Amino acid sequence: AAELKNTLGLAGDEAGGLAMIAQTTGRSIDDVTASIVDTTSAFNSANRSAISQGQIIRDVAKASDGVKASLGGNDVAIAKAATAARRLGMELSQVDSIASSLMDFESSIEAELEAQLLTGKNINMSKARELALNNDLAGLGKELFKNSASLAEFGKMNRIQKEAQAKALGMTRDQLGKI
């Protein structure tokens, strides 16, 4: 763990988290780190993004026990979810919270219908709810990105429309504004 702190600039708890993932998967820390870097690079290439590999290593290392358990302790799955979260301008824990809010089906569907009525935009969150139900946080991140308003659209909305759009996505207005 001390080597990770020096080499990757990780905090003590982050280095410990990465070491635990390596131990759980039966792989070396170097293998785990390399797979996280490869996963981030592949995501960046596929999505024309520039998400920091170091940030994703830190995000994977500090993923909550609940997220790790939901994703089977798989470093690649956690890295995919973390990159999808960062693409949204969020941390993995925030996407996990959104997944939880989408599981309140009645409220989620009500918010979706309200947003459609107020914005005139077709919003379909059924796939997002399915992904949340199946603990697919990477897929959920992509689905949230797909259903978010573009910056131009978001800028034209009034405050009530912005709040409704964000609520339908399980987010706050500020979170939606970051996308």
Predicted feature locations:
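Amphipathic alpha-helical assembly segments
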Residues: 1-178
